[in-house]
Amino acid sequence: MSSSPSLNTWSDALSGFSIGWFPLGLVIVAAIPLVFIALYALTYGVYGERKISAFMQDRLGPMEVGFWGLLQTLADILKLLQKEDIVPTVADKFLFVIGPGILFVGSFLAFAVLPFGPAFIGADLNVGLFYAVGIVAIEVVGILAAGWGSNNKWALYGAVRSVAQIVSYEIPASIALLCAAMLAGTLSMQQIILMQAGPNGFLHWFLFTNPIAWLPFLIYFISSLAETNRAPFDIPEAESELVAGYFTEYSGMKFAVIFLAEYGSMFMVSAIISIAFLGGWTSPLPNIGGLELNTMTSGPVWGAFWIIMKGFFFIFVQMWLRWTLPRLRVDQLMYLCWKVLTPFSLVSFVLTAIWVINH
């Protein structure tokens, strides 16, 4: 596939302007639209989980606030804003306060390299995939700060479990993504997508051009569930054992920020798997004879639509699994990581290398 020039749209557009002596202003201005889009999407991700959970339990879910309960999440935010911000007297106040902030920053910084379309990306880094994986790992620091700073044994147990889980599953997840990078020959997210673009839609995606790609695809998806503490890997938040895990002592907006960070991570890993194996913002529809479906459903607006829909699809699957699979034990969690996913990820890496050499 042919490559395209750099698409650092926002940074290029802002490069001709200067905000006084404060260069950071350029970054802030560029980040504002992305932050609002992310917050809007994640706010309704909470609403979506409530509705999906209700459907699977034969309930209606939120219905009273707005049409079909669409304003329920906004009402909850207003409620949390009015809640008392409680800091335990025995807590390490600095760590207790900064923990949710680190979680939030770690979750949303990765959006800077996420391509929402052919010309809608914060920064097209040539190591974008590596950056996204690494920056999400910052959440480990926030989790540990929240658990330790709470000075609560249940919070600390939950934090230690979460850190062990995230660090362990980063290994098979990273190796699985390296398979996609090897197929594309680059770590740039935009270039990985462009390598999967073409008039035949989904037939150009790595998942359908390389049978080996199914193995790293499944490995990364399973690992992403563990990295985001989603069921059946929600051991750090096991209510029957740890009350609420590392955020047991949090209330008000600090509690809300932790949940926003969780949903931000859910969308981020869903977007990464879409980019690495399912063509990112490219249309799945092929051109059939004179019916140019792919051409008609491509472009900046369609690109944003497709990657958001692919991301929401994987978020739906994560929510679906929450109500389908029982929670694993700690020993089962570690066994799956070190004795199943990690060896298979190495096998997939070798097979992908052989495929690339021979094709």
Swiss-Prot record:
Alphabetized GO MF terms: NADH dehydrogenase activity; oxidoreductase activity, acting on NAD(P)H, quinone or similar compound as acceptor; quinone binding
Domain of life: Bacteria
Record Pfam families: NADHdh
Main subcellular localisation: membrane
InterPro entries on file: NADH_UbQ_OxRdtase_su1/FPO (IPR001694), NADH_UbQ_OxRdtase_su1_CS (IPR018086)
UniProt key word NAD: yes
GO biological process, one term: aerobic respiration
Subcellular location field: Cell inner membrane
Keywords linked to the UniProt accession: Cell inner membrane, Cell membrane, Membrane, NAD, Quinone, Translocase, Transmembrane, Transmembrane helix, Ubiquinone
PROSITE patterns in the record: COMPLEX1_ND1_1, COMPLEX1_ND1_2
TM regions (residue ranges): 19-39, 94-114, 127-147, 175-195, 202-222, 255-275, 301-321, 337-357
Gene Ontology terms: cellular component: plasma membrane
Subunit structure: NDH-1 is composed of 14 different subunits. Subunits NuoA, H, J, K, L, M, N constitute the membrane sector of the complex.
Protein family (similarity comment): Belongs to the complex I subunit 1 family.
Name this protein carries in UniProt: NADH-quinone oxidoreductase subunit H
Organism (species): Chlorobaculum tepidum (strain ATCC 49652 / DSM 12025 / NBRC 103806 / TLS) (Chlorobium tepidum)
